[in-house]
Amino acid sequence: MVIPEIVKHPLFELVGVGVSNPDKVGRDVGEVCGLDTTLGITATDDIDALIALKPDALVHYGPTAAHAEENINLITRFLRAGIDVCSTAMTPWVWPTMHLNPPNWIEPITAACELGEASCFTTGIDPGFANDLFPMTLMGLCSEVRTVRASELLDYTNYTGDYEREMGIGRPPEKKAMLETPDILVFAWGGTVPMIAHAAGIMLDEITTTYDKWVTPNERKSAKGVIPAGNVAAVRFTINGLYQGKTRIQLEHVNRIGDDAAPDWPTGNQNDVYRVDIEGTPSIFQETAFRFTDGSGRDAAAAGCLATGLRALNAVPAVNDLSPGWVTALDLPLIPGFGTIR
């Protein structure tokens, strides 16, 4: 999805592409991406060959944190070679100092950055820029923030990612989802809550969670199949940063199968949005919708995925300019998208 955007960008030069699917190895990258032309770059699974190209950065769209060992092994090889990494894979790394990040996830990256004098930046959409860059930028327009909430309000009807075991969508309500366990939920999604607290100069009292399910009274169809009546077709969870006994920072998700699911739960002014609600002086309310308007027919989920990939790509020059080590959204300057207007 990102490669076609790289090849036409005036700032970036694609020098190599690594793949994990054996069926893609040895094929021209243009063919792999379904482009009308070849690129003269062969997809490879040879990491040493990619490192030998001496790129300015690896933009890494690897698997999720469920594959931590694989991700860490690959990323550290590039960092030790002095190659900066901008990744969307290990989302707990959006805030590396979060207390739930295990040392064996953090220490190898720290050591590799020191050895190679390289930097490692992790981003995403949520957790990521929709609940770190967006709310913190808007907080900078206030004299006082009483509460700040960043919400993902998405219809998962066309989403094909994993959510049954993780969220409980599509399953009987009595089956406990992985994310109903508070520490797992905070670990997977909550890194931006302590990040915002740090940026605001406060120390949270504690982080709490809520998790609710909505059971569909009728059968529903999605891209992944049929959800029978009586099963979960929407979930709502919150991760809450408490300060002075009150929830001051909140991350919220409402994910549903069908716009009419869980009608009493929050929705956007249009479907599929990321929203920031700040109660303060002044209060600010912002909704962001990612869409394709090029007639391609690609949906909002695909637009959000592309934006996520491009956040990592566009961060490369700024990350190159930083001192070695971990990089978070708080370390980056404004990234206005040089070369995007052409």
Locate predicted features:
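Conserved active-site and cofactor/substrate-binding residues in soluble primary-metabolism enzymes
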Residues: M1, D45, L53, N73, ...
